[in-house]
Amino acid sequence: MCAGSACEEITPMRHRYVFSLLLFTIPIAAAGQAKSPMALFPGIELEWKDGPPALPKGAKMAILEGDPTQPGVFTMRLRFPDGFQVFPHWHTQTEHATVIKGTLHLGMGERFERSSTTALVTGSFGYWPAGTKHFAWAEGETILQLHGQGPWTITYVNAADDPRTARP
């Protein structure tokens, strides 16, 4: 036996309303799932290649998602040897960085000054907006994960620091 609103009779109109909602929401949920394929990259299976030409020699990279040279989402890892340096530069998109291994010393500004950097140790995360002038150096072998919107570009503050234009 019921009492009050807990025993309201479910009318045919209410059935149609609930059924219509289900018919509308199930395809939307399924479509969202279809656009999100899963990808796993166990660390030992990454394919490391020479780093992008915009970085000094010695850098290695592994692309996890997308294509950093094209518009759209990308995720890549960069591996730097001990003492690796990237001189002051900026990007056209916001940069998101996570230190996977080692220590990345990051500084802001137009002059490379080791003493004015912040040590980002394993597990550190940071992001900075497009146009932010910054520089970095690695202490120990360092692996950095970058993700964001492509194309990923680097413009050096001092054109002479750009490895793409450096003379042998």
Region spans (language model):
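Short, Lys/Arg-enriched N-terminal segments with co-localized hydrophobic residues
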Residues: 1-12
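Bacterial N-terminal signal peptides that target proteins for export
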Residues: 11-19
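Hydrophobic h-region of N-terminal signal peptides that target proteins for export
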Residues: 23-31
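A short, N-terminal "cap"/entry segment at the start of jelly-roll beta-barrel domains
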Residues: 32-74, 117-118, 159-168
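Glycine- and acidic-residue-biased ligand/ion/polar-headgroup-sensing regions
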Residues: 81-84, 90-111
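Short beta-strand His + acidic residue motifs that chelate non-heme Fe in jelly-roll/DSBH
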Residues: 86-88, 106-107, 128-129, 133-139
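Short acidic-glycine-tyrosine-enriched beta hairpin
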Residues: 110-131
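Ligand-binding loop in jelly-roll beta-barrel domains
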Residues: 119, 130-153
